[in-house]
Each structure stands twice: as structure tokens, then as C-alpha cells.
């Protein structure tokens, strides 16, 4: 992402409008189910309490809630997150089965149901939390695009990945415009639930260079966990970059702080956006075992992208 120093300008909206940028945010896990189950429920890396989650937290605080999803509603990788989503007051899934089954749908198709929610008035003393769960750059990134990717390097998988970042940035711009037209103050919190790394099997076992490999899930590299977390607010100006290290295991605390909710069950909810590093930085591997971040390997950008 250009917002985080990438050379191609694939985030023009965030470059201009991001007010708070967490430079060193790490996802709770290496894939969507692990990351969101531990990041959006009362967990902190231990047993998951799925009934205490971001939706129930918001509802208990009196917020109207909506969950709009371009991910799957059913399946091995989707049902657990879907169970959280269906606790919201308003629920829309573009897909009725798994994320990779049936007719392809694209993230910008969530704008219409978003607009429908925004058109439903709320009492003047009530707020609303709207969650948009998108596909973003999920493998295979070429499947996330409605058109051929632009050419940046001689690797189409990489080209598609770059263009999905640009596509997500454009989606955030559309959401921002819709919120502006609502005439109400608003705040947007954007984050990714995991990163990707170059697939070692595709370049170590097939005698090709790393720059020609594809991007996949893994739990061995820092890049599998290093993710964007950005706030865009109608009442903020300028851009603040926070270099504090944060694990997605504290994400629910961060969402609570963003929403202005305080509870003893979320001990980090008053300091998630502080400039102090988390004391013990851990993430979860594929087996949901805690591993220290400083033990992760590095998967740097290939030379043709520097």
C-alpha cells in the first residue's frame, strides 16, 4: 500500500483522508477465521467467548448495528464469522454459501445495501455501527477484479494484488462519499484481518525466483500479520502516524475505544491508540498457538517492487 510506503500510488483516497494510521498493526492470526474470531470476540489469545463480540458490545452500548458482507455465509471458513454477523440488527450477505462458491460478487456491490441502511433514520441520540466485510485482496487476487489488472511487473498475481489494493481504496472513497451525503458526523475504521507472503513451494520447489511466485496465506512471516489499520473521521483534520506495536488480539479493545465504550473486560480499551507499545506482542499460528512476533521470519519485497 502506498499509504505504508509502497512505490505505486495505489491508495490515493487514504493518502489524502487517513487521519490516524497505525504503522505497526499485526493481525491476530494468519487467516480470516482465526484472526476475526480472536480479534472481534472476548479472547485476548485464550479461549474464544463468541457470545461476547463486537456486535453484542455495540448493541449493549445502545448502538444500532448492521453487518454487510461479501464473504461467505456458510462453510468451513465462514460459518463462525457469520454467526457473529447474524447477531446484528441488519444483515446482508451477497453470498449465501462459501466465499469461493457460486456467482462471483464484488466488494462495491455492498454500496447499495450500505445506502439502504443509511437511508433508515435513527433517533437523534442514537448511533449506528455498520460493518462491511469485504474480500479485498484475498487469494486469488485476480478473482477479485472485474477486469484485467494493470501491468506493473512480470507477475500477474502481483499485478492483481496491487490493483485489488487500489480497488479497496476506491471502495473506501465510495463509503466516505455515502457517509458525507448522509449529513451526519461519522468515523470509518479500516483494517485487514491478515497479510500474505510469497509461496515458498512455488519458488523453492520449482526453480523459479521469488518475484515470480504467488502470494499465499502462511504463519511463518511477519508479512503474514502486518496489516493496515486506519481511521478516517469527519471531525478530524491532518494525519497522525502511530508507531506503537499492536496485536490483533487486542483489536476488540481498539474498536471499543474507537466507539467510546469502556468496560473492565477490555483492559486495553483506553490505551489501544496510545503511543506505548504492547508489553508482550504475540500472534496466533494456524494451530491457534501463541507465537512471539520477534520470532517471525522476514519476507521482504522482491527487488522489482522496491
Pin down the residues of each PLM region:
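A generic fold-level signal
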Residues: 31, 124, 160, 183, ...
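Flexible, surface-exposed loop regions and adjacent strand-edge segments
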Residues: 148-151, 206-208
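Active-site/pore-lining binding-face segments in mid-to-C-terminal subdomains
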Residues: 196, 230-231, 244, 257-261
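A long, amphipathic alpha-helix that forms part
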Residues: 111-120, 149-191
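Histidine-centered active-site microenvironments of extracellular/periplasmic hydrolases
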Residues: 5-9, 184-185, 191-233
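C-terminal, low-complexity/hydrophilic appendages and adjacent surface loops
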Residues: 222, 289-306
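Active-site-proximal alpha/beta segments of enzymes that process anionic O-linked groups
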Residues: 1-148, 224-226, 248, 252-280, ...
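Active-site rim elements
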Residues: 44-45, 155-163, 176-177, 214-218, ...
Amino acid at each position: 500500500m502506498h499509504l505504508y510506503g509502497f512505490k505505486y500510488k495505489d491508495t490515493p483516497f487514504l493518502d489524502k483522508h487517513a487521519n490516524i494510521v497505525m504503522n505497526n498493526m499485526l493481525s491476530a492470526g494468519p487467516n480470516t477465521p482465526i484472526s476475526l474470531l480472536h480479534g472481534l470476540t472476548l479472547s485476548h489469545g485464550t479461549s474464544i467467548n463468541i457470545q461476547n463480540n463486537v456486535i453484542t458490545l455495540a448493541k449493549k452500548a445502545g448502538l444500532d448495528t448492521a453487518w454487510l458482507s461479501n464473504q461467505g455465509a456458510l462453510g468451513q471458513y465462514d460459518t463462525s464469522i457469520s454467526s457473529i454477523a447474524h447477531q446484528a440488527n441488519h444483515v446482508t450477505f451477497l453470498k449465501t454459501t462459501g466465499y469461493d462458491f457460486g456467482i462471483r460478487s464484488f466488494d462495491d456491490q455492498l454500496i447499495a445495501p450500505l445506502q439502504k441502511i443509511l437511508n433508515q433514520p435513527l433517533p437523534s441520540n442514537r448511533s449506528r455501527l455498520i460493518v462491511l466485510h469485504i474480500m479485498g485482496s484475498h487469494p486469488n487476487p485476480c478473482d477479485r477484479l472485474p477486469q484485467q489488472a494493470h501491468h506493473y511487473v512480470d507477475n500477474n498475481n502481483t499485478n492483481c494484488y496491487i490493483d485489488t489494493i487500489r480497488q479497496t481504496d476506491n471502495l473506501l472513497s465510495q463509503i466516505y462519499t455515502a457517509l458525507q451525503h448522509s449529513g451526519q458526523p461519522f468515523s470509518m475504521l479500516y483494517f485487514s484481518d491478515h497479510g500474505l507472503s510469497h509461496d515458498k513451494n512455488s519458488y523453492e520447489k520449482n526453480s523459479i525466483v521469488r518475484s515470480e511466485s504467488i502470494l499465499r496465506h502462511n504463519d511463518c512471516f511477519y508479512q503474514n500479520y502486518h496489516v493496515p489499520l486506519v481511521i478516517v473521521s469527519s471531525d478530524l483534520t491532518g494525519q497522525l502516524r502511530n508507531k506503537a506495536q499492536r496485536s490483533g488480539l487486542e483489536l476488540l479493545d481498539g474498536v471499543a475505544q474507537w466507539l467510546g465504550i469502556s468496560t473492565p473486560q477490555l483492559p486495553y480499551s483506553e490505551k489501544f491508540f496510545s503511543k506505548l507499545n504492547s508489553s508482550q506482542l504475540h500472534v496466533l499460528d494456524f494451530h491457534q498457538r501463541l507465537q512471539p512476533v520477534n520470532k517471525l521470519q522476514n519476507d521482504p519485497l522482491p527487488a522489482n517492487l522496491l
